[in-house]
Amino acid sequence: MGLDCYVVHGNDRDKSFTSEDDERIKDIQLCGGMFSGNGFDGSFRGKVYDPLIQELSNGEHTWYIEQEEDAFIPTDKLKEQAEMLESFFLIIIDEHGDLDDQDTVYVTNDGWAEYTLKEVHDLMTLLRVASERKAVMCVWY
């Protein structure tokens, strides 16, 4: 089942949260979907990154929400997820030192997905910036 994620303004969910809102996300490159972009425009293919979020949180967080309409991840949850990714990122850097952006740093337990250092950093940055700016993340599948 597909999952697209759209970071939007918390006070206006019809307005995408993009690099025009905060320059820190202008170089983000995440996996895009048929209806989503690559992160710098606030949208990305959530199906690719949800396994990482689920595994790092031991199942506490998921972007698949059982809600028919208006499904979104609130600001405080985005902050928790950004902090979790930051902790993971710092552990990777501490344990492995100098890594290239394209080095694989995590493979899901089932082997379905693997993530590069840059992907983890970019997802962390997007979620952190979104939470700082009080954005929310609408999810659609």
Task: Name each region found by the language model.
Residues 1-125, 129-133, 137-141:
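Acidic (Asp/Glu-rich) sequence patches and key acidic residues
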